[in-house]
Amino acid sequence: MDLSKWCNLKTEPSLKHLTEAGFGVPKEKQSVPVQELVKAHIESFDQAVTDGLCRVVEAIPPMEFLYKGDRISLSFVEAIIHTPSVSKGGISRDLRVFPAECRGRRCTYRAKLVADVSWSVNGVPKGIIKQSLGQMPIMVKSKLCNLHGLSPKELLEHHEEAEEMGGYFIVNGIEKVIRLLIMPRRNYPIAVSRPKFKSRGQGYTQYAISMRCVKEEHTAINMNLHYLDNGTVMVNFIYRKELFFLPLGFALKALVDYSDYQIYQELIKGREDNSFYKSCVSEMLRIVMDQGCTTKIKVLNYLGERFRVKLNLPEWFTHEQCAHFLLDECLCIHLKTDVEKFYMLCLMTRKLFSFAKQECMEENPDSPMFHEVLTPGQLYLMFLKEKMEGWLVSVKLALEKKPQRVGGLTPDSMTKLFNMGTDLTKAFEYLLATGNLMSKTGLGMLQNSGLCVVADKLNFIRYLSHFRCVHRGAAFAKMRTTTVRKLLPESWGFLCPVHTPDGEPCGLMNHMTAHCEIVAPVYPTSTLPGLLCSLGVNAADGNPGQAYSDCYPVILDGAMIGWVEKEVAPSVIESLRRFKVLGEKKVPPWTEIVLVPQTGKASLYPGLYLFTTPCRMVRTVRNLSLGKQELIGIFEQVYLNVGIFEKEIEDGVTTHQELFPHSMLSVVAEFIPFSDHNQSPRNMYQCQMSKQTMGFPLHSYQYRSDNKLYRLQTPQSPLVRPAMYDHYDVDNYPIGTNAIVAVISYTGYDMEDAMIVNKSSWERGFAHGSVYKTEIIDLSEKVKGDDSIVFGVKPGDPKVMGKLDADGLPFIGSVLKYGDPFYGYISLNTGQSHVYFYKYQESCVVDNIKVCSNETGTGRFKRICVTSRVPRNPTIGDKFASRHGQKGILSRLWPAEDMPFTESGMSPDILFNPHGFPSRMTIGMLIESMAGKSASLHGLCHDATPFTFSEENSALEHFGELLKAAGYNYYGTERLYSGLSGLELEADIFIGVVYYQRLRHMVSDKFQVRTTGARDKVTNQPMGGRNVQGGIRFGEMERDALLAHGTSFLLHDRLFNCSDRSVAQVCMDCGSLLSPLLEKPPPNWSATRHRKTICLLCNKSDSIETVSVPYVFKYFVAELAAMNIKIKLDVK
């Protein structure tokens, strides 16, 4: 990891790059800060498909079974994922497939997974067969991607962005991102108290120690140790979504061939004086003896006999082998030897008893200290392992279904059999396309949906925030408790306190800070135990110089290494930290070193914990004692003293210092100018609104075929911006416009956050934008089974004359209106032509048309991709916002001649109502207005990084002096003249330059009007929904408004006459709406004879009356009658 990247942060923003001589020429290298934003995604995927795939192959056990009395064994030897390419039989100059082609053709960017499968009969190897297991989705810009390592110039040649970041998958032409999810910290025993544990069985208490055990290839399993009210401990684990319980004594006895006394001595370490605990340990060992399990072999046979029915192992496995399988796959699976598992279970038992007796505190499972992140590579690898195991099972089932023919198995027959195995392609595409996990084991996860989201390219800021977002999990969204949503102090510097949505996902969907990274590499730690012992740590089976109660247990990645004395521990920590920072003794730079001290009262369970595992969050700070930068973790940070400013540093107390005062903000939050002068909710709103801005999301519009893209036609570089704006080169993808804003209540059209825009500014293109919509037209789907259908029109067809070209497609640049011919196709066999007409109400311009071929590049072209451009000038009702959460809608386009003007004759672009400031307290916007004004007068670009100004160094003084030097008022006000009367306004008006954003919420997308139209078939009421031209909902609030205005009879028209008025017949005597029916005519009646309506209950017709009722009421009465409930009407 490069720790020097934050040293060269630009401090003074500049506009020089806007007038560079070499503008438009691609740079030699991509911007490192922009590429770092997706590093967690790409690094984890690279790790998964290289080293991780090898580990998966090693970890998958052989599939062994009986066939015709022979023992068949199938196992993977090697697996490799190739780079994306077309099949060799196709017509193409280059076999490589690039992401732009997959987006255009709406297909998946994928590559072939090939495995070497070894098979043997009765233990005799029969050879290795190379087998394709399917097509795997490939992450863009990863090592397997064809874009990997390309320069910006080469990326442009392949129709990508010069700053293409990657980090996503392309499934059916749509860019999908695997979400970063919060998971419990791996291989760390957490003390939890949950009342629902009591319902697990008789004697269970709420106390437990929970551990999420994770192997090197990321296979995870959750294991609990439960405390029972009789003082014994029960081990609980999940295997194939089933819950199993095992008394602790059996687990310990099965792991090591120790005597009961040796096990007893290990368990009571540090608690030798606690007689209750010693009696509990004796009782747990006595339970094992009562079952006749006196030795390790007997315990293994005992467990294997009881568990083998659930393990699905070959019938020739002995009970002992079954028990070993159980211990390997279900107990502390992150540890490789049984002795390590034994020591870890003993440590967890000691912690459980300390917790049950209130000697240590409960650990908050919602605290970031005990969290890590589920990365895309981790999920990809876990899912791949399960599906490869499933492939072996499918081959076994295919062999068992094979008819019992004479003759044995041959390499040819096995190859045919392997081809019948389950293909992995659909499973992976389903996972990425829907985000739903179809798994038999659950992969140790808390949710099986919402794992993937679309990488929405609404603008650059929204796009990058997808890769920095960390979600707590779908399971917590349904909880009524608010504890999971709270911002805890431990998250300082790792999770942004500002960048979280308001509303339902608040506090659950968080974003990593700009300095936060996720550890991806897996580093060998085999040398660390020896290093620890050389520093003064005693081995787990050794004897320290002091009593165990005066020592700390040392845990490295969930393995008990040994014990360290209290007095020696601080020096061990200091030495390890020095090795870590200086890169000595093979200590990884991302190692987390945590010493939880003994406090003499109930606190966290003391110990020396070392973490080198991947998927943890780390960030960069400055180590004051060594004068270098250091990566620290969340758990580690709690026990460090980190200062922010120089004046806060105390010698001997402060150990580290923040690199910048704004280190605790996310990338998006750092784009807010002067955010330290705003109220915090306004900064939260701005983080959301900057992701809804109509901006410039990409440069390759002509090569894209997204369903919908927005484009701001007149973007500008902000005159006032934080340092991070230039650090991430946001000027390449601008999101707004500098506007002259006057704070004045000039008309009545700017109340309640509305704003007035100068009509002449609007005519000059202020905030003008357009929407690009793409439609895929596939003739093979429209007319299935007919290969003679192609695009085209009949020559001389008057319907399409001048509208469609000879190929049946519209002209590039032509305007399409409702009812215009859109495209035509013709049958080469019959000569019959069809024309499809444009069905949308909004007119558009045909921007470009792409012709798509099939996989092999053969056959007639039947698939096109039409991109149309819809111009969107701002209209009344469109939403705008400043960068300070001050959102409002355009209420009126005011003529320039009626706008107020300054002494120099300048008219503002926007009139902002001054009532928007007092309650919102967005002082940052006032400062930006003054700063923007001084920047435009002096030709400068001001730094708006938060915490730059303070009470000693006032922003008002700084920008006021600049305004004064330019000949303007110190406080940013000016004398304005009325545009109506020409007279000078009495008050001084605050006027300046503010960067405004146009949001994507436009009236053109939302307005809805209807007179008559579609009705619901069941209720006969007008249908809802804009797409079906449905009615507008008339709800309770609208009803109350009419009542409050004293126009209650209008409700009769709105809710009855214009809704579902119908005529019904009711019996006056019995009040029934259902019983009046037309009498059934006898056969000899003529068709013209009048039939009477008779009540079936009263058997007479003179009591029938016609009434007007809502149709839905008739439906409701019929539904109640079906439930044997009678409705009686009182008709007068």
Swiss-Prot record:
Q: Does the keyword Nucleotidyltransferase apply?
A: yes
Documented EC number(s): 2.7.7.6
Q: Which reaction does it catalyse?
A: RNA(n) + a ribonucleoside 5'-triphosphate = RNA(n+1) + diphosphate
* A cellular component term, taken from the record's GO annotations: nucleolus
Q: Where are the zinc fingers (C4-type)?
A: 1067-1098
Where would you find this protein in the cell? Answer: Nucleus, Nucleolus; Chromosome
Sorted keywords for this record are: Chromosome, DNA-directed RNA polymerase, Metal-binding, Nucleotidyltransferase, Nucleus, Phosphoprotein, Transcription, Transferase, Zinc, Zinc-finger
- Give the observed phenotype of the deletion mutant: Knockdown of the gene by morpholino antisense oligomer reduces neural crest cell migration and causes severe craniofacial defects.
Keyword Metal-binding attached: yes
Chief location of this protein within or outside the cell: nucleus
One Gene Ontology term from the biological process aspect of the record: DNA-templated transcription
List, in alphabetical order, the Gene Ontology terms for molecular function in this entry.
DNA binding; DNA-directed RNA polymerase activity; ribonucleoside binding; zinc ion binding
| TM ranges | none
- Which family does the record claim for this protein? Belongs to the RNA polymerase beta chain family.
Functional note: DNA-dependent RNA polymerase catalyzes the transcription of DNA into RNA using the four ribonucleoside triphosphates as substrates. Second largest core component of RNA polymerase I which synthesizes ribosomal RNA precursors. Proposed to contribute to the polymerase catalytic activity and forms the polymerase active center together with the largest subunit. Pol I is composed of mobile elements and RPA2 is part of the core element with the central large cleft and probably a clamp element that moves to open and close the cleft.
Q: How does it assemble?
A: Component of the RNA polymerase I (Pol I) complex consisting of at least 13 subunits.
This chain belongs to the protein called: DNA-directed RNA polymerase I subunit RPA2
Which organism's genome codes for this protein?
Danio rerio (Zebrafish)
